[in-house]
């Protein structure tokens, strides 16, 4: 963990902080799907998504390996008049509390070992919003990232969450934030035994 922490802290120190950065497009588009309650932002970075969730009334835990990034996240939260709880942790070993969160988001970070923890960490009826890069970036004319360990195979997100109710899925090259990205995006619900709640959520998607 120590080497990764140092590497990411240095990366953030060398980068300029942009407090006006926008949250992820999928979050903004599907804000109506946000439940009430607790949210977890995995690999939260400088907090753009965590703060957006807090602005919509969620109690947010923002987890990242970089203390520098999370300091910036707290600064952003204060500037926006909200609170988030920051947790410095190695996500390779982070134990997500079971049956605890109403919403979990994971953007631009892939560790397949975390998937079971994400599923267990969501309450019944809870929502996962997941978006990260696809394998074969160069075949799309893109050059980052390149390590296949951290890239999704085609339809992999659908397979990983096949036991959830899929509310939204897309996969391909999309232009967002002024750049082209080869990504997969998924919103899914941990199946709730009360079908009326799931039907209500479906109507919100449509």
Where are these regions (language model features)?
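Core SAM-dependent methyltransferase catalytic element
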Residues: 172-206
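A short acidic, Gly/Pro-enriched loop at the edge of an enzyme's catalytic core
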Residues: 94-103
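Conserved SAM-binding strand-loop segment of SAM-dependent methyltransferases
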Residues: 80-91
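Conserved class I S-adenosyl-L-methionine
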Residues: 1-34, 37-45
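Conserved beta-strand signature within the Rossmann-like core of class I S-adenosyl-L-methionine
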Residues: 126-133
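Conserved SAM/SAH-binding beta-strand->alpha-helix loop
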Residues: 66-68
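A short, conserved alpha-helix within the catalytic core of class I
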Residues: 110-122
């Amino acid at each position: 963990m120590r080497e990764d922490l140092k590497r990411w802290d240095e990366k953030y120190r060398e980068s300029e902080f942009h407090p006006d950065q926008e949250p992820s497009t999928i979050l903004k588009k599907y804000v109506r799907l946000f439940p009430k309650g607790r949210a977890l932002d995995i690999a939260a970075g400088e907090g753009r998504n965590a703060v957006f969730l807090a602005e919509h009334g969620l109690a947010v835990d923002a987890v990242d390996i970089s203390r520098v990034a999370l300091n910036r996240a707290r600064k952003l939260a204060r500037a926006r008049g909200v609170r988030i709880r920051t947790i410095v942790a190695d996500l390779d070993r982070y134990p997500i509390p079971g049956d605890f969160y109403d919403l979990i988001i994971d953007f631009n970070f892939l560790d397949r070992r975390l998937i079971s923890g994400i599923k267990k960490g969501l309450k019944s009826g809870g929502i996962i919003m997941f978006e990260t890069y696809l394998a074969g970036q160069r075949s799309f004319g893109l050059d980052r990232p390149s390590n296949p360990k951290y890239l999704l195979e085609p339809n992999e997100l659908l397979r990983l969450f096949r036991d959830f109710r899929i509310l939204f899925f897309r996969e391909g090259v999309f232009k967002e934030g002024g750049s082209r990205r080869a990504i997969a995006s998924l919103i899914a619900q941990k199946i709730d035994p009360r079908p009326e709640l799931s039907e209500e959520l479906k109507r919100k998607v449509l």
